[in-house]
Design a protein with these regions (language model features):
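Gly/Pro-rich interdomain helix-loop hinge
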Residues: 109, 216-217
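Internal mixed beta-strand/loop scaffold within catalytic domains of large alpha/beta enzymes
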Residues: 123-214, 222
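A generic structural signal for short, solvent-exposed coil/turn residues
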Residues: 12, 141, 173, 192, ...
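Bacterial Sec-dependent N-terminal signal peptides
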Residues: 1-22
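General secondary-structure propensity
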Residues: 7, 224-227
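C-terminus-biased signal that marks the final domain/tail of proteins
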Residues: 21-131, 228-374
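Internal, well-ordered alpha-helical segments in soluble enzyme and binding-protein domains
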Residues: 220-223, 233
Length: 374
């Protein structure tokens, strides 16, 4: 599968701050038809990048976030009321990375979208239950020693997010260049990778029975932006996660794709319990949540038995095509977006749902992030 670039969008912008710093933005497209994805590259300070992204995305971001918020409120008008969402944001904001808050503020200024509206939309994942799939395979498990990751996001297409897919590549004045795979107007991260080959994915595990959730801590969608900015190694990722106050329950799949150092860790964040997190590496026989453990593989999917059978059949020969097959195999019926990473070569394959088909039924569009990280 090769990247199909459809022209360079004439959206090059330039912003000069009072300190002489410059921010730039441009975009181009990968994929065709309903599978087309906009790739936006932006540089500058967090606030500057937010302003530029807001200017560039203002029309589609407004549509995207309005649909998203309307869908959440239609599903649960009390839980997702504007008052409740803003309270959730206010409770959680002291734990947020300041760069993210600065970017969101800039996005509001650039787009003209009310900041409280954006805060409410970004708070929906804080208070909502969800489920997904995650896999890391590297070393002896892969055919070339590269580290591959799957991140399947299983979320309702009723929210319409699939109509607004974007890959935003950030090149901050301070921090590591990184890619956030998501949707117009959504600046938090459900998955991403940085130029140091750090790759991040998640599987939700918070049951609705535990509502309302305690929000006094970092939510993974904001934590991921912090990790993408700052983590150069897997050890950095582990240190930041383990020294952070976290919330809710979810699995985190974190990996470092650098050759000879490639490895991954699976976390179960369980902050409502006395033991607030569990950590497993490959071949950890204490991992009772999967039917079988393997060298150089960590996983937890919606269909673990099928995933294990797949590993038995393809072990030692796993590459991007095999991971795409596995992503399709373990996808649920409500499958919004799937991402396959080669964290070693800094490539991704992204599939987004349409109004009539799940992401796993669509084309996995190839994007080589190396060219954008330069």
């Amino acid at each position: 599968m090769k990247s199909i670039l459809v022209g360079l969008s004439l959206v090059l912008g330039l912003f000069v701050s009072g300190y002489g710093q410059k921010s730039k933005i441009y975009s181009e497209f990968a994929g065709e038809g309903e599978d087309r994805i906009e790739i936006i590259v932006v540089s500058g300070t967090p606030h500057q990048m937010g302003v530029e992204l807001g200017r560039h995305l203002k029309n589609q971001a407004r549509q995207s976030m309005e649909k998203y918020l309307h869908s959440a409120q239609k599903e649960d008008s009390v839980l997702c009321s504007l008052k409740n969402l803003l309270l959730a944001w206010k409770t959680n904001e002291p734990f947020m990375d300041k760069r993210f808050v600065e970017e969101l503020t800039g996005f509001s200024e650039g787009s003209g979208i009310d900041l409280n509206f954006l805060k409410a939309a970004h708070a929906i994942p804080f208070i909502s239950p969800y489920s997904c799939s995650g896999v890391d395979a590297w070393g002896k498990a892969s055919g070339n020693g590269h580290l591959y990751q799957i991140r399947n996001l299983d979320y309702s297409t009723d929210a319409g997010l699939q109509d607004f897919p974007v890959v935003i590549v950030y090149k901050p004045t301070k921090g590591i260049a990184h890619a956030n795979i998501g949707f117009s107007g959504m600046l938090s991260s459900h998955t991403g990778m940085n130029s140091k080959s750090i790759v991040l994915g998640e599987k939700g595990e918070s049951p609705s029975a535990e509502l309302p959730y305690d929000l006094h801590g970092k939510h993974f969608t904001i934590l991921f932006r912090e990790l993408l900015y700052d983590a150069k190694t897997l050890s950095d990722v582990e240190r930041i996660i383990e020294n952070s106050s976290l919330i809710k329950r979810y699995y985190l799949f974190v990996g470092d794709g650098k050759l000879k150092k490639g490895a991954a860790v699976k976390y179960l964040i369980s902050t409502p319990d006395s033991v607030r997190f569990h950590k497993w590496r490959d071949m950890d026989k204490t991992d009772i949540h999967v039917p079988k453990v393997y060298n150089d593989i960590t996983y937890y999917t919606m269909k673990n038995d099928q995933a294990s059978k797949f590993f038995d059949e393809h072990y030692g020969h796993i590459g991007a095509p095999e991971m795409i097959k596995l992503s399709k195999l373990v996808a649920s019926d409500g499958n919004l977006v799937d991402v396959v990473y080669d964290a070693t070569s800094l490539e991704i394959w992204v599939a987004n749902a349409t109004d009539t088909q799940t992401a796993s039924s669509r084309e996995y569009v190839h994007i080589d992030l190396k060219k954008y990280f330069k």
